[in-house]
């Protein structure tokens, strides 16, 4: 079994430990998954991660691979672009600061919703990959945030310590994803999320980015406190959305604000 498969198994087991509680005696007929996010009204908390595909609708968000867009010339340092990026979070690999800053300036010129550093790329440094090791300090993050002029996200936060550093550095948001600990047998995203939420909720926006197989998994992350769920999946967004709507109806949650711990069952101890 590959290391990636082992991580998937841990992620799946952690998610399945949170069981949805059916509530059928209520008056919820239709559900509303919209919210106001960074001043923009969006229809769904599901945020797909893509290489070069614009959001499915003006009221949807998406993560885009900024390194890919820069390398292919689809972003060239002004407001003209193959896509309208005002609904996009543009994710960069955390390289050297001297190389990052010119990229940040080019990306900011396109007026994206936010920029992000994809810290999960550091899991692929030697001896497990060819990505160069360029960690970022609190001061680096604060400098990038100041230079960006748009909200800065950190994708791939997998510990309370890093979440606290991110909060202290003044970033807008973190995305919790244990892929950063791929080769460390790190805790699954759903396992570490509650600790991170308890530590920094209210000081930084917290999103989830772990394994998502269905809209039911999206619901689980939302119940743990995620504002949105960043999804690396080939599944159609509409299918995930239909499944999330189903989960909300069957648990009596009319809006995203209704989704919370009371909608899930997570036994702490097994009976001996």
Task: Give names to the regions the model predicted.
Residues 112-140, 157-196:
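Glycine/Thr-rich beta-alpha phosphate-binding loop at enzyme active sites
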Residues 64-70, 83-88, 109-113, 147-150, ...:
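Glycine-enriched alpha-helix->loop->beta-strand junction motifs that scaffold or abut catalytic
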Residues 98-109, 158-171, 195-208, 212-228, ...:
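Catalytic cores of alpha/beta
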Residues 1-43, 268-272:
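An N-cap/entry alpha-helix motif that binds or orients negatively charged groups
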Residues 1-8, 235-272:
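C-terminal extensions of enzymes
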Residues 121, 169-187, 212, 218-238:
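Glycine-rich phosphate-binding active-site loops on the catalytic face of alpha/beta enzymes
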Residues 82-91, 133-153, 185-208, 239-247:
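Alpha-helix-loop-beta-strand connector modules within alpha/beta enzyme cores
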Residues 36-78:
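Active-site cofactor/substrate anionic-group-binding motifs, chiefly glycine-
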């Amino acid at each position: 079994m590959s290391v990636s498969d082992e991580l998937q198994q841990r992620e799946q087991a952690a998610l399945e430990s949170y069981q949805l509680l059916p509530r059928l005696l209520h008056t919820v007929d239709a559900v509303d998954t919209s919210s106001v996010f960074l001043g923009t009204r969006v229809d769904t908390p599901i945020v797909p991660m893509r290489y070069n595909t614009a959001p499915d609708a003006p009221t949807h968000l998406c993560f885009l691979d900024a390194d890919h867009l820069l390398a292919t010339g689809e972003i060239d340092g002004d407001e003209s672009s193959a896509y309208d990026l005002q609904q996009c979070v543009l994710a960069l690999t955390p390289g050297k600061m001297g190389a990052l800053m010119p990229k940040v300036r080019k990306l900011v010129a396109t007026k994206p919703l936010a920029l992000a550093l994809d810290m999960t790329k550091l899991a692929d440094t030697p001896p497990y990959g060819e990505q160069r090791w360029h960690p970022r300090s609190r001061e680096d993050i604060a400098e990038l945030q100041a230079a960006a002029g748009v909200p800065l996200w950190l994708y791939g936060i997998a510990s309370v310590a890093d979440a606290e550093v991110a909060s202290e550095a003044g970033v807008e948001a973190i995305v919790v994803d244990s892929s950063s600990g791929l080769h460390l047998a790190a805790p699954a995203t759903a396992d570490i999320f509650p600790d991170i939420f308890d530590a920094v909720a209210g000081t930084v926006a917290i999103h989830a980015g772990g394994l998502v197989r269905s809209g039911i998994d999206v619901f689980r992350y939302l119940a743990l406190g995620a504002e949105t769920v960043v999804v690396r999946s080939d599944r159609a967004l509409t299918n995930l959305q239909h499944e999330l709507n189903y989960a909300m109806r069957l648990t009596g949650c009319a809006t995203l604000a209704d989704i919370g711990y009371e909608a899930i069952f997570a036994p702490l101890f097994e009976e001996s």
